Amino acid sequence: MTVPLTQYLLVAAILFTIGVAGIILNRKNIIIILMSVELILLSVNLNLVAFSASLGDLTGQIFALFILTVAAAEAAIGLAILVTFYRNRGSIAVEDIHMMKG
């Protein structure tokens, strides 16, 4: 039993919509914004893997692995900056980020 391509695309579209809604609706918490960006990247990966499997080509799956690697590095760096910012300022509000200049 195989799952049709349209169902994969529907799940990816739902994940993408949730990620965009998370960014639009919650602009005050940087952790929620980082998680929303990760959801968007995962939806893109799901699209790549679904189309790759549908077409019988491994290129999309390999590209998805590269995107996962970059997303993991982005999350690690983002969280490290967040922890440093919280230690220095005592807040993780997006409004306070402009004080990082210099």
Swiss-Prot record:
The chain crosses the membrane at residues 5-25, 30-50, 62-82. Disulfide bonds: none annotated. It is found in: Cell inner membrane. It comes from Beijerinckia indica subsp. indica (strain ATCC 9039 / DSM 1715 / NCIMB 8712). Pfam families: Oxidored_q2. The keyword Transcription regulation does not apply. Keywords: Cell inner membrane, Cell membrane, Membrane, NAD, Quinone, Translocase, Transmembrane, Transmembrane helix, Transport, Ubiquinone. Its main location: membrane. One of its GO terms (molecular function) is quinone binding. It is a multi-pass membrane protein. GO terms for biological process: ATP synthesis coupled electron transport. It is an enzyme of class 7 (translocase). Its EC number is 7.1.1.-. It catalyses: a quinone + NADH + 5 H(+)(in) = a quinol + NAD(+) + 4 H(+)(out). Gene3D superfamilies: 1.10.287.3510. Belongs to the complex I subunit 4L family. NDH-1 is composed of 14 different subunits. Subunits NuoA, H, J, K, L, M, N constitute the membrane sector of the complex. InterPro entries: NADH_UbQ_OxRdtase_chain4L/K (IPR001133), NUOK/Mnh_C1-like (IPR039428). This is NADH-quinone oxidoreductase subunit K. PANTHER family: NADH DEHYDROGENASE SUBUNIT 4L-RELATED, NADH-UBIQUINONE OXIDOREDUCTASE SUBUNIT ND4L. NDH-1 shuttles electrons from NADH, via FMN and iron-sulfur (Fe-S) centers, to quinones in the respiratory chain. The immediate electron acceptor for the enzyme in this species is believed to be ubiquinone. Couples the redox reaction to proton translocation (for every two electrons transferred, four hydrogen ions are translocated across the cytoplasmic membrane), and thus conserves the redox energy in a proton gradient. One of its GO terms (cellular component) is plasma membrane.
